[in-house]
């Protein structure tokens, strides 16, 4: 299940649960789509990428 994070979250700057990456679009996850590129926070949550 995805949850909002970063600039798009309420409150802004919210981190993802369980240390997941916050994508550039403000969604939490652990795949390359969330953790690479312009990831907002916790971008090293999946070091195998």
Swiss-Prot record:
Disulfide-bond pairs as recorded: 5-22, 16-28, 21-35, 39-43
Family matches, as PROSITE patterns: CHIT_BIND_I_1, CHIT_BIND_I_2
SUPFAM superfamilies the UniProt entry points to: Plant lectins/antimicrobial peptides
Entries under Gene3D superfamilies matching the protein: Endochitinase-like
MF terms (GO), sorted A to Z: carbohydrate binding; chitin binding
Protein's UniProt keywords contain Kinase: no
Keywords from the UniProt entry: Chitin-binding, Disulfide bond, Lectin
Domain Chitin-binding type-1 per the UniProt entry, residue ranges: 2-45
InterPro entries the UniProt entry points to: Chitin-bd_1 (IPR001002), Chitin-binding_1_CS (IPR018371), Endochitinase-like_sf (IPR036861)
Domain of life: Eukaryota
Additional facts recorded: On the 2D-gel its MW is: 10 kDa.
Quaternary context: Homodimer; disulfide-linked.
Chain's role: Chitin-binding lectin which is specific for N-acetylglucosamine oligomers.
Stated name of the protein: Chitin-binding lectin
Organism: Viscum album (European mistletoe)
């Amino acid at each position: 299940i995805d949850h909002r994070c970063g600039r798009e979250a309420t409150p802004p700057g919210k981190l993802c649960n369980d240390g997941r990456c916050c994508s550039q679009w403000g969604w939490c996850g652990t795949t390359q789509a969330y953790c690479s590129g312009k990831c907002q926070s916790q971008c090293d949550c999946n070091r195998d990428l």
